[in-house]
Amino acid sequence: MYECMFFSHRLTIGFYIPLIVLTTMSSLSESLGERQKTACTVAAISCANSDTYNRTTVSNHTFFYISDRWKYSELIRYEKPTGDLRHDKLIHVDREFLDIVSLLHNNENQLRTLLTIFRSDSAPPWVKFMRGYSQCLDHPIIYTCVEEKCQQYNLEELPYGKDIFLENVVGFDLGAPPHNMSVLIAVSNTKPKITKVLRITSTSLTLFDALYNTVLTFFRSIGARNVDVVRRLILYQASLSGPHRDAPIHNYLNRDLS
């Protein structure tokens, strides 16, 4: 299922078929790093030289991902706003505004980037207000324009898929329990060479279960059971009782790591 891991102060777990990238903060001993140097290095070089994968760089870390440019993840599905939308404040031309404009201007993945910005936790009020423009029409039509070539889309009829890795997922963030999980997605514009990581909240316990089982399976397979990331995941999972989960699911790994 997985082919290699990359270790540094920032722990990166790479899965190549299918390719998944998970990130979390941790530190590991040099002896653990030595185990994966040969096979992992060969796989990484092969992947980096392949045209099969897209790649992006965030904070000097290169992430590889498989992307279907004609399909979008449910994670960034357009949600038509409800209620009375009003925006009575001035839009300030500040750094945040310029960053968003730079991401969108002449971006070949303009629609995907816009949908991600719409759903991001850090979207400013004026961006959230833009989601309601379609209320002026009877259907949510949008136009994207790149190099003066424009295309029309109906945001409610886009081909959405359940796989979150249709997007450029570079990590997950587990906040304070009982359940506060975010997916980190990198969006880029190659023309001004800008990349920004956006955070989208996920309430999916299924996604957490997959993350939990994947990480524990990997560390068990290399005999590293008592590492910080494993301990934190186990404690986090234990906090998901009560209203978040009536009973443990059947396919959970045995949590006894002794």
From Swiss-Prot:
It holds the Pfam family Cytomega_gL. Residues 36-243 form the gL betaherpesvirus-type domain. The keyword Coiled coil does not apply. It is a peripheral membrane protein. One of its GO terms (biological process) is fusion of virus membrane with host plasma membrane. Interacts with glycoprotein H (gH); this interaction is necessary for the correct processing and cell surface expression of gH. Forms the envelope pentamer complex (PC) composed of gH, gL, UL128, UL130, and UL131A. The pentamer interacts with host NRP2. Forms the envelope trimer complex composed of gH, gL, and gO. The trimer interacts with host PDGFRA. Belongs to the herpesviridae glycoprotein L (gL) family. Betaherpesvirinae gL subfamily. This is Envelope glycoprotein L. It comes from Guinea pig cytomegalovirus (strain 22122). The gene is gL.
